[in-house]
């Protein structure tokens, strides 16, 4: 997160967003946290926080409030979604997460395969037994196939079935439910107060 995702997102979009104006596609930031005019952080903070949100604090917010992974038990497909007031930011972050996960695992698996191939080539040079050389040759063939797969596609771990899109309908908050619940609770509270006064 710190090396691959955080440098590619605008931190106030994660840590200081108040709302999003769909007519102008403008993000409005919380004035208590971030000065949009000067592009500086002005938030109140207490130890261990800092004026500018740290990578750990940003990671906690991103993982607990923004990012969602779910797996369909029947198909095994994984759905990655981002919750954000701006659907454009949500789309961009979803694409970023998929790209960076693919990149991370491609680099990791490529390094492991290369190390294994070097080791196997060294073992092949050291041994004279035909049976062991045959086993090593099979292992080398498997590693070569893996290297080919790693290099062949940009979508190494995750591939899109349904690419990230700008959503037309809000996911949260559902204002109608909030209004109905507020009216219901207000009515109950009002009746309770009337009963207490009598």
Where are these regions (language model features)?
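Non-transmembrane alpha-helical coiled-coil
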Residues: 97-157
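Short, charged, surface-exposed interaction patches
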Residues: 60-64, 68-73, 114-118, 122-123
């Amino acid at each position: 997160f710190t090396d691959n995702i955080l440098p590619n997102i605008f931190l106030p979009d994660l840590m200081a967003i108040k709302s999003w104006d769909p007519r102008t596609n403008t993000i409005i930031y919380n004035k208590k946290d971030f000065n949009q005019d000067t592009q500086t952080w002005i938030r109140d903070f207490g130890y261990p926080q800092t004026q500018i949100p740290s990578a750990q604090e940003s990671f906690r917010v991103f993982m607990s409030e923004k990012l969602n992974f779910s797996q369909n038990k029947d198909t095994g497909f994984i759905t990655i979604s981002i919750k954000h007031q701006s659907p454009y930011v949500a789309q961009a972050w979803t694409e970023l997460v998929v790209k960076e996960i693919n990149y991370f695992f491609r680099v990791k698996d490529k390094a492991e395969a290369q190390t294994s191939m070097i080791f196997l080539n060294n073992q092949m040079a050291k041994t004279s037994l035909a049976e062991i050389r045959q086993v090593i040759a099979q292992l080398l063939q498997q590693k070569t196939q893996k290297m080919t797969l790693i290099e062949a596609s940009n979508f190494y771990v995750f591939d899109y079935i349904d690419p990230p899109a700008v959503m037309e309908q809000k996911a949260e908050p559902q204002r109608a439910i909030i209004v109905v619940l507020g009216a219901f609770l207000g009515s109950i509270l009002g009746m309770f107060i009337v009963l207490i006064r009598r």
